[in-house]
Amino acid sequence: MAKYRGKPFQLYVKLSCSTMMATSIILTNILPYDAQAASEKDTEITKEILSKQDLLDKVDKAIRQIEQLKQLSASSKEHYKAQLNEAKTASQIDEIIKRANELDSKDNKSSHTEMNGQSDIDSKLDQLLKDLNEVSSNVDRGQQSGEDDLNAMKNDMSQTATTKHGEKDDKNDEAMVNKALEDLDHLNQQIHKSKDASKDTSEDPAVSTTDNNHEVAKTPNNDGSGHVVLNKFLSNEENQSHSNRLTDKLQGSDKINHAMIEKLAKSNASTQHYTYHKLNTLQSLDQRIANTQLPKNQKSDLMSEVNKTKERIKSQRNIILEELARTDDKKYATQSILESIFNKDEAVKILKDIRVDGKTDQQIADQITRHIDQLSLTTSDDLLTSLIDQSQDKSLLISQILQTKLGKAEADKLAKDWTNKGLSNRQIVDQLKKHFASTGDTSSDDILKAILNNAKDKKQAIETILATRIERQKAKLLADLITKIETDQNKIFNLVKSALNGKADDLLNLQKRLNQTKKDIDYILSPIVNRPSLLDRLNKNGKTTDLNKLANLMNQGSDLLDSIPDIPTPKPEKTLTLGKGNGLLSGLLNADGNVSLPKAGETIKEHWLPISVIVGAMGVLMIWLSRRNKLKNKA
């Protein structure tokens, strides 16, 4: 150290240089790797995280791809859209699209399998119903005796039972129907027993190689296919959800019930023994299914649908009989039942056609059932005629319908001409068909589709069309269901027709469930609503006070609300949401009369310019008023 003691500067220089060299060596060996790693990482981030605009564009494109997937349900599409809106990177978007495509492909394959199975079952059912129409036409003649009804039946047991029914007089209508239900149950039990026995026999190797070879050869690729389809599209009557049973084409129990109603209508069956004849027709179909050479799984599915149809008839009959048994005023009970299903105008017309004097409950129930069944035969002509019939301003409604194909001036002129000529509602419908024919549309179906396609509020338009035939609250529920099930405009109309043609008898069950729900709610709220007031507690000893006298005086006479007329039923020309209606404030309210925030946002987006002008004008006006007041105060 003595050597460097006199030269401290040289020592510091050497130490500094050594330190710098060591540091440079270390940095030279480490930094390139860090720089390379950082560069690679930056490249990955650049590829992964797109710019904000590019990401939004990719999300929009992905959402359009999701919309084009045909097999995905509406709820699944909304789920994937929500995930896309939350995606932060391109890889997340690609992964969501991949999952959606896989699910769509899977649903497509299962849908084809189920549709093929359902199509096969429906074709067999159509053939059976056609054969039944040819063979058992005698069953549907309302005035025939029970012995004549047996011409379509090939079972000895059914012959004996039905012959006994024919010997009953009108006073035993209810017993006849009960016996028919018992016979149908007994027949089903016998068929199922024979089916189980044949199944056990077919499992025997010695037998399966002989007589059953032909039947087994038919079944390999069809096992379970019918159950898969029917379990998906149909459910039993205890299922309160209609969404999985309402389809654009009648299937299963709906198809059977509709075919029987058509058959009874074509044969001009009277209301006498109506339910009994309906059950006899169903029994004939059950026997035909049992005697066919169909594969066992298809036969089982078809017989299950027959049993569902029987339960529907039984349930509807029980509800009607219960209502009639509650009161001695049969006309009032009948009116109550009709008004719970039909709209007021239809209920009044039907009530005039029903005879209650001197009739048993079963005979009244037969008349009501027949009219409910006729609701299933509603055609598009009937719907259009009812729309025009129930409108307050026919000319306006006709013009709105014509404007879906013609210009406003021409539509207004034609509408005025037709109303001034005094054409009947049916004649107006015929004229509408002629003018729609010029654009290639020739039927009432096409006209109603045009109405739905051009309606600004699809749900309200569907409700309006249904409400021309059924009670408005039921129409509202069905319209809500239809718009939730289907968004395809081409299929919405089919669902509307299916709701009337296949679910008319469900309306009574729906009303029963609504009544039960109302009772449950009343039971819950009763302790709150009916709790005693402060005055009741002060006056608990029952002494008459001045307040009691005042209350009695105020309660004398008619109620204050009695003088206020009922709210009129909305007219079709105002509720179909056709014609002009794109004003600044249109669409701000939902069906319940509350402000709809999504619709309000859409309205502001579409009309931002006039809204901006109005808001600006109001601001300028307020500033001017403020300054004017200041000047007045100074003066």
UniProtKB/Swiss-Prot annotation:
Disordered: annotated span: 101-122, 192-228
A Pfam family the protein falls into: GA
Compartments, as annotated in UniProt: Secreted, Cell wall
Sections of the chain in a coiled coil: none
Membrane topology label: Peptidoglycan-anchor
Principal location: secreted
InterPro entries the record matches: GA_module
Keyword ATP-binding: no
Intervals of motif LPXTG sorting signal: 597-601
Regions of compositional bias (Basic and acidic residues) in chain numbering: 101-112, 193-202
Protein name: Surface protein F
Source organism phylogeny: Bacteria, Bacillati, Bacillota, Bacilli, Bacillales
